[in-house]
Amino acid sequence: MATDSASCEPDLSRAPGDAEGATAEAAKKEFDVDTLSKSELRMLLSVMEGELEARDLVIEALRARRKEVFIQERYGRFNLNDPFLALQRDYEAGAGDKEKPVCTNPLSILEAVMAHCRKMQERMSAQLAAAESRQKKLEMEKLQLQALEQEHKKLAAHLEEERGKNKHVVLMLVKECKQLSGKVVEEAQKLEEVMVKLEEEKKKTSELEDQLSAEKQRSAGMEAQLEKQLFEFDTEREQLRAKLTREEAHTTDLKEEIDKMKKMMEQMKKGNDGKPGLSLPRKTKDKRLASISVATEGPVTRSVACQTDVVTESTDPVKKLPLSVPIKPSTGSPLVSTNTKGNVGPSALLIRPGIDRQASHSDLGPSPPTALPSSASRIEENGPSAGNAPDLSNSTPSTPSGTAPAAAQTLGAAPQNHSQAPPVHSLHSPCANTHPGLNPRIQAARFRFQGNANDPDQNGNNTQSPPSRDVSPTSRDNLVAKQLARNTVTQALSRFTSPQAGASSRLGASPGGDAGTCPPVGRTGLKTPGAARVDRGNPPPIPPKKPGLSQTPSPPHPQLRASNAGAKVDNKIVASPPSTLPQGTKVVNEENVPKSSSPQLPPKPSIDLTVASAGCPVSALATSQVGAWPAETPGLNQPACTDSSLVIPTTVAFRSSINPVSASSRSPGASDSLLVTASGWSPSLTPLLMSGGPAPLAGRPTLLQQAAAQGNVTLLSMLLNEEGLDINYCCEDSHSALYSAAKNGHTDCVRLLLNAEARVDAADKNGFTPLCVAAAQGHFECIELLTAYNANINHSAAGGQTPLYLACKTGNKECIKLLLEAGTDRSIKTRDGWTPIHAAVDTGNVDSLKLLMYHRVPAPGNSLSAEEPKSGLFSLNGGESPPGSSKPVVPADLINHADKEGWTAAHIAASKGFKNCLEILCRHGGLEPERRDKCNRTVHDVATDDCKHLLENLNALKIPLRISVGEIQPSNDGSDDFECEHTICTLNIRKQTSWEDFSKAVSQALTNHFQAISSDGCWGLEDGTLNNTTDSCIGLGTSSIQSIMLGSIPWSTGQSFSQSPWDFMKKKKVEQVTVLLSGPQEGCLSSVTYTSMIPLQMLQNYLRLVEQYHNVIFHGPEGSLQDYIANQLALCMKHRQMAAGFPCEIVRAEVDSGFSKEQLVDVFISNACLIPVKQFPVKKKIIVILENLEKSSLSELLGDFLAPLENRSTESPCTFQKGNGTSECYYFHENCFLLGTLAKACLQGSDLLVQQHFRWVQLRWDCEPSQGLLQRFLRRKAVSKFRGQLPAPCDPVCKIVDWVISVWRQLNSCLARLGTPEALLGPKYFLSCPVVPGHAQATVKWMSKLWNAIIAPRVQEAILSRAAMNKQPGARQTASKKHPSQGQQAVVRAALSILLNKAILHGCPLPRTELDQQIADFKGGSFPLSIVSSYSKKKGESAAWRKVNTSPRKKPGHFSSPMWNKPDLKHEGMRNKSVPHLNINRSSSLSKQQSLENDLSMTLTLDHRLSLGSDDEADLVKELQSMCSSKSESDISKIADSREDLRTFDSSRTNPVTSAPVNLRMPVPQKEASPLSSHQTTECSNSKSKTELGVSRVKSFLPVPRSKVAQCSQNTKRSSSSSSNTRQLEINNNSKEENWNVDKHEHVEKRNK
């Protein structure tokens, strides 16, 4: 306690001293509160607050010591132990008022001090508050004065500036007016001159075009004629050259034959008896007829006439030899009529006779000359004639003319043989010398396959056998000599030791000498000399237009004789059924041949053999022969069985290095006659085995090769079953049997040989293995077999060619794929340094190159099918995968590998112009296009023009250029369909591109893009047409750019970096260039223009109106983007004001039906738009947006605000009542802007009172900006979908976009004519149209949803509101909408049907079949023909009613609606109650659409006795009539006349008959209305049956009035109109298909069951 008192006492002692000191100091300074400054007042206030705090502390301390002080004062002087003192205390306590305490009470003193302090505090506070208020008022007045002075100065300066400007402008305008007036006169004169010149130029141009077209036609005709003549000349020249060569060679050979025959005759005279002597000269005579020639060879070629060739007199010995003319294979052609018995099909005739002039028989010199006697007998056409030769009784008989020409067509048929061929030696001609060491087996087998020697021909003459016969007599008198000569055939074996021209097999090559180098394939060339001729009849003559073709027939083929049951081969019976092939020519022996006079084997029965016209050799054993032996070339350049018809060789050709063989190798009894009988004989298949001296006949290895080469599986299997046979035997060219089979693609033979353990890698002399030759020929099945048997897939031939290299040369992708999957090495090089990639590129085969570069080898254990999805990097049919979808498997070293000349694969592709191959190579990241060859040339140096362009763009960076408008905040202003970014093009940035070029490219791309999307012309504008102006018609240009982002790095046009653009983009990894447009945040509207496609000039004009008038309302049809425009303008104004230093705020108020005027007052007051009259206006800018004003009455909502809004000052206040009930005077200040949006096309009623107090901006659908907005918006969307490119006008996307635009325009046009402006639609609802390339159905589906959810309900509501406007005003109008009359329902259905036909479905680019599938999704549009009976009676205007019927020349009867027929009440009453409305919602849709459609369909249940009872309904119907019949309106003037352009739609898919076509051509006059005739009634059944069978008929859904004269026909209550101009089809009411009621689906189901 003592401490507390001690601590408080100094405070009490100091406080009065401080107060006195302050008072004295204040007195000195003449203290005056009014003169104090603000800082001094604040200091005094703080001092006062300190004093008050000190006072509070003192009070608390005194209160705490109060009790102690009281006790001390009262009892401090007494001692409680002293009774005297206690008595004294009590006395004092009980003393009266007169006796006071000894000391004064301190509490009273303290209270007095506190009262005084409190008074002083109140006084000072009042003085301080008055000082502050005065200070505030002073500051405010100062600021206002300063602002007024500044404004005055600005206005004065601005006034002077404007005066000067106006004066200058007036002077300039006067001057310009004078100049322009002069220019107008000059321009008018120039225009007239230019127009005159233009007309002249047009005339000249048209004349030149006519002359040019005529000249083109004439030149085309002359070119065709010239080509035809050149072709004929070439053909004739080749034929004449071949003929001359043949004649020269033939003349020489005939002289040689004469000398040889003389010598032989001398030898024959030395014989023992005369009969053998007779046969020998005849035998030698036959040698004159063996012929070998090549059609295209020069003097080095020598030919010997064949036995079957026609020989004329010695003066012209080879005049009748046929020439080779390529013809098409045809069994009916007289030139190819008898390719029989020799397996020589017409496809041998398809070889072009001049492909390779290197093929020739060049070494015919060593043959000893043989000559024909000059008196050779002449051959008649149909029989023999007596000859002049003493040793011949008859000449060789003739043959049908088709035989010789058919074989003659193969002249030069094997030009692919690049080797020189020696003369063909007679394989069976006899000789005087005998060979003592002849194999006895050959002699024994010689008669095994012989026929009778005395077989007569069809003319009764013995057939002269081919030169392979031992003896060849021609008369019946020499039969014995023939048989005796056969016994001495061994003497002829030694004749082949000397080189001489032999005769080819007769049947194997009909006139073998004219068949080029191809070997014969006939099987009966080794028949006995007396084989019977074929019974072919007289031949047709040769057409005269074939130059050089001999019309004199050659001798026929000898008859093929064999056993019907089978051919006996080495004591084995092998079945030989007759071959039957399509389009074959069946050869049948029709005569029995008399037996020989000497004992011989019995004649063999003939085989009925059909020779296929396709040219395939037919096996007599198992018909397993599948191909022909092509001319062998060491380079493997000729595929045997790929991409061409089978080549059937028809003569013998061997290399010149091979010497003749003995006759025993081809004698009739030789062991290889087994091959002849079994599968046909082709001597060229087996190269001659020995040279010089007598040689044995061909052994089993040779037969094995022949069987493998010809694909004779039966013979091959027989030979492989023999013991001791060397299956790996190789001929002189080192060709094994497996090699031959693989070369010709005989898969079965390859399989047999591999199973027999043939050497799979046996190589020929050039190093080619069977796998190599199979790859070169493209036989992928053989490759698969060989690789399965572990063939060396990386084997290199003599030149380094691997199987993969050869396959790439051929270009067979299956072979390449098999080899790659087998694991072959892609990098093996040839001797010239070429890799398989070089080979693939050299042929220009894109698929081969893709396989080499991208095909991955499947992992072990994975099947090919499992690997396909991973390795299927491209389609082998030519389709390319997108770049970057796969990585190449070949390394860069292989792609860049150079050959001996330094050329890479890219050099080859570029030099040959293979752009596709070069492009694939360029996709490899490691390609080095700058690599130089040994001549210091790069790929670009040797490239063609196309490839140079590709290489120039090779390293170009393709960076997309995008336009960004910033983020679009989600809102209800219609911006949900807007996108933030759009791709406009792709920039190609090359290494040499500079920053200046880059700036120009960006600017040009932006300019082109803006002009392309804003152009009102057609699609597909080129860049060259877009460079006329700097800004587009929507006002955007390069000046609209805010900034450009290179990835994330900002860049501006004209800016340069130290690095080039290519290096910069590469190193910074720039993926796109983004152009940011100036937007509201910058106080501009460019981004708003690009986003909404509203022209920039119009937006700027709207902004000017808002800033100038302060009160603006945007109104137009619903969906005209009013809300979006208002919000964007407000945002732009806000940022402009903020940039100027003024705060700004946007207030949005959404008006609905419950929004009251009081709520609007609260909005205005709370946001300081309305301020009290006594209050000064604020500097803050406030923008109020009232949205959806159409939902409230403008006069009620804004009526009280009109005057204050128009006069914004305190002079025109308005009293408003607040929400709390108080009222006060307010006014609108100048910094408040009011924007409103109204979704109405026009104002009506009391709303017109508001119109004059606001600035109205009307957004009409048929004027800008709405008119072209949709077109520009969808065009930009299409450009973005196509990555910045405008699609072609014929593209389906363009057609579907144009259709959507026309739908919007035609829909609004029809609604405007209908008088329902409240149903008009702005473009907003159509902005969400999906633009999907290749999927037009999605757009039609979207259109159906839009129709069901938006268009149809709005049309229904608008029509019903119009119909009920006058009849049921006020509150009853809503009830009328819910329960419309039947007439109103009919009008609604008619209107929907017309709109769907004329606005929606008209012009849809979908095909009719696809559109029919989509039609059912459009709800509420099925309006069948019906009529209101009372209308015609009431109005008496049936002629006007006729205008509703849009089909021409309609004859109305008693109509009734098949859709709305009310069923019999007795029978269907309960059903009507249970089914209240038609089932229109058949297809699934959104729940909103379903509810809307249900509401719509409930209004469409009609009674069949409906009528139009009101004048308003009649007016609506008249509008519908005029709309349907009028063709004057531009939007609907393109309605098609044909039935296909009008679409069918029905509310029921199961009843397609309840509709009729709508023909919008012309109205029908009243006089044509007549009852339906019975003829028309009959036709309806046909129409019905066709319709039920799926013939889609177009329907008309318009109400048609009943005709009075048709009321009697009660049996025709249904009708269906036709588009015919003369009659109308009517449907009988009696059929169940037409009896429509509410539950029609049940009837349909019953009928279907």
Curated annotation (Swiss-Prot):
Modified residues (Asymmetric dimethylarginine): 495
Compartment list: Cytoplasm, Cell cortex; Cell projection, Dendritic spine
Single GO MF descriptor: SH3 domain binding
Biased composition (Polar residues): 330-342, 492-503, 1547-1557, 1571-1584, 1621-1630
Comp. bias (Low complexity): 15-25, 395-416
InterPro entries: Ankyrin_rpt (IPR002110), Ankyrin_rpt-contain_sf (IPR036770), Cortactin-binding_p2_N (IPR019131), Dendritic_Spine_Reg/Scaffold (IPR050889)
Region entry Disordered, spans: 1-27, 322-439, 451-476, 492-604, 1438-1471, 1527-1649
Chain positions of ANK repeats: 699-729, 733-762, 766-795, 799-828, 832-861, 901-931
Compositionally biased region (Basic and acidic residues): 1528-1546, 1631-1649
Superkingdom in the source lineage: Eukaryota
Residues recorded with modification Phosphoserine: 1510
Entry keyword set: ANK repeat, Cell projection, Coiled coil, Cytoplasm, Methylation, Phosphoprotein, Repeat, Synapse
GO CC aspect terms: cell cortex; dendritic spine; FAR/SIN/STRIPAK complex; glutamatergic synapse; postsynaptic actin cytoskeleton; synaptic vesicle
Keyword Acyltransferase: no
Entry-linked PROSITE patterns: ANK_REP_REGION, ANK_REPEAT
GO biological process, one term: regulation of synapse organization
Coiled coil regions in record: 118-275
PANTHER family (alphabetical): CORTACTIN-BINDING PROTEIN 2, ROLLING PEBBLES, ISOFORM B
Function field: Regulates the dendritic spine distribution of CTTN/cortactin in hippocampal neurons, and thus controls dendritic spinogenesis and dendritic spine maintenance. Associates with the striatin-interacting phosphatase and kinase (STRIPAK) core complex to regulate dendritic spine distribution of the STRIPAK complex in hippocampal neurons.
Subunit structure as annotated in this protein's UniProt entry: Interacts with CTTN/cortactin SH3 domain. Interacts with STRN, STRN4/zinedin and MOB4/phocein; this interactions mediate the association with the STRIPAK core complex and may regulate dendritic spine distribution of the STRIPAK complex in hippocampal neurons. Activation of glutamate receptors weakens the interaction with STRN and STRN4.
UniProt name for this protein: Cortactin-binding protein 2
Species the sequence originates in: Rattus norvegicus (Rat)
Gene of this entry: Cttnbp2
